[in-house]
Amino acid sequence: MRLFLNNEEPRAKSFDTYAKEVVSFGAGKHSESFKKNGSYVTMACPKCHRKITFEYYNNDGIGSFRCKNCGHSGSEKADYSVENTDFERRKFTLRGTEFRMPYDTPYMLYNYSAAVAVAEKFAGIAPEDAAKAFDTFKNVGGRFEILRYKGKTIKYMRIKQENPETLQTSINVMASDSERKMVCLGLCPLVDLITHYANTF
């Protein structure tokens, strides 16, 4: 079995012992990477349940990590790693090929590296050929869209809020945008719809 795993996400990387072949994807440190001080809660190691430390984060819960107890960590560099990220020019390199960045948000870097990894390993599409598709790539509508209306730019982000990290990452993206802005947060309560999954016989 071949697994494509995020090299910088501790839970995903912990599956590396379950496959004959692991293809890792990730992103190197870039201008939007950040550190947290000791007052922030960190996640438990998925292998030994002790504290994981991050050298830096590329997104909340994703970055260069190591468990000091069991040694669980990402490789120094993923097999498919986004490097030389330039958010202003909207460019990055991956396996020596320059790519245009359709969406200049840090969390998309992992989608880009995963897509190139799957394209080459699964479909035989070389990175230089995959780079051509990035020129016309459009994200699925409704998740992250940039709209223009009456001279204003509207950046619409919708998240499923599976965990606090997804909300925090979205807030980080908004905060890192230096443009003057108005922010509207619409939070929907998460309700437990037990009748949809419980045995009701």
Model-derived segments and spans:
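Extended acidic/charged loop-beta regions that coordinate divalent cations
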Residues: 13-100
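Short, charged/polar "capping" segments at the starts of alpha-helices
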Residues: 9-14, 31-33, 191-196
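Active-site beta-alpha connecting loops in nucleotide-dependent enzymes
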Residues: 140, 158-201
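A short glycine/serine-rich beta->alpha loop
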Residues: 98-106, 155-156
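A conserved, hydrophobic alpha-helical segment in the catalytic core
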Residues: 62-75, 103-135
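Gly/charged, well-structured mid-domain segments that form the phosphate/adenylate-handling core
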Residues: 85-87, 119-159
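Short beta-strand segments
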Residues: 6, 26, 184-188
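N-terminal alpha-helical interaction blocks
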Residues: 1-18
